[in-house]
């Protein structure tokens, strides 16, 4: 996990702790095996590197920022700032489309659509509707399991595939019905004709084992989580508000979403800060 949480310094400027990949390289990432929580995927170029820095790097020239001090500690650019900064990153992806779980244990790889709701099997929480337990037994299942709303199939956007198989891509029609479940992302990118092969997609990956250890999905990446009082309080709050948080998170990532009130806007910011913190 240390490889993903530590930033590397280059030419006096820190790189982001998360990496950006193009969707065409999606198959390489899924087979990599060690992808920790909240690693963001879209294209391989880290956006903290400017064109001037790239040219200097190719010429083996070290650039020093005139406005920086030797003792100044640099911070990585936040993903939220990166998504909102359209002037400097016109071609950057703007929407987080999906959250996926890469599980190390034998069983299924679970695709967590943000439009679904989740409950904790370890805390024996109950909720209205059917709960589909994924995996051969509860030990291989994530503590947050998708609740499939059978009455609203048009809103479902989940895809469960066997490990080491390509992640399946659901292509939506105008009516919202999911089609072509057998078309993999890799195949859609190669064909170049599929509408679902969107180059501006961002995929957020986290490990199933990490979720089981932290007991909640979206949280700060603190190494001393089990000994931190604030982290324990956040964990309890997330247990109580998991339904509303996931529902609101799904609304936040919509491009035309506007908060209905100041309280909702404040909650949106808190959730985004929690999800995008690294």
From Swiss-Prot:
Keywords assigned: Meiosis
- What disulfide bonds does the UniProt entry report for this chain? none
- Kindly state a single biological-process term from the GO annotations of this entry: meiotic DNA double-strand break formation involved in reciprocal meiotic recombination
Q: What is known about its induction?
A: Induced by transcription factor mei4.
Question: Which Gene Ontology terms of cellular component type are present?
Answer: cytosol; nucleus
Null allele outcome, as annotated, is: Causes severe chromosome missegregation without greatly affecting sporulation itself. Reduces recombination by 16- to 76-fold.
The entry describes its oligomerization and partners as: Interacts with rec15; the interaction is direct. Interacts with the DSBC complex component rec14.
Specify the protein name: Mei4-dependent protein 2
Task: Give the organism the record lists.
Answer: Schizosaccharomyces pombe (strain 972 / ATCC 24843) (Fission yeast)
At the highest ranks, the source species' classification is: Eukaryota, Fungi, Dikarya, Ascomycota, Taphrinomycotina
| Gene that encodes the chain | mde2
């Amino acid at each position: 996990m240390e490889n993903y949480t530590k930033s590397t310094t280059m030419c006096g400027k820190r790189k982001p702790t998360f990496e950006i990949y193009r969707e065409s390289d999606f198959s390489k990432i899924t087979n990599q095996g060690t992808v920790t929580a909240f690693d963001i995927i879209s294209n391989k170029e880290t956006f903290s590197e400017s064109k001037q820095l790239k040219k200097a790097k190719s010429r083996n020239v070290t650039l020093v920022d005139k406005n920086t001090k030797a003792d100044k500690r640099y911070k990585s650019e936040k993903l939220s700032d990166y998504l909102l900064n359209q002037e400097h990153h016109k071609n950057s992806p703007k929407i987080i489309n999906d959250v996926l779980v890469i599980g190390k244990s034998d069983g299924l790889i679970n695709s967590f659509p943000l439009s679904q709701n989740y409950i904790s099997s370890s805390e024996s929480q109950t909720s209205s509707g059917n709960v589909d337990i994924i995996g051969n037994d509860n030990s291989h299942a994530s503590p947050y399991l998708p609740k499939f709303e059978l009455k609203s199939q048009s809103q479902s956007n989940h895809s469960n595939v066997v490990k080491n198989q390509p992640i399946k891509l659901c292509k939506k029609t105008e009516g919202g019905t999911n089609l072509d479940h057998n078309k993999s992302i890799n195949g859609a990118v190669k064909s170049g004709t599929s509408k679902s092969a969107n180059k501006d997609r961002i995929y957020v990956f986290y490990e199933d084992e990490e979720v089981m250890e932290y007991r909640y999905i979206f949280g700060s990446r603190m190494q001393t989580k089990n000994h931190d009082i604030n982290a324990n309080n956040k964990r309890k709050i997330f247990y109580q508000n998991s339904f509303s948080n996931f529902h609101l998170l799904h609304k936040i990532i919509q491009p035309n979403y506007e908060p209905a009130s100041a309280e909702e806007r404040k909650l949106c910011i808190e959730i985004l800060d929690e999800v995008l913190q690294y």
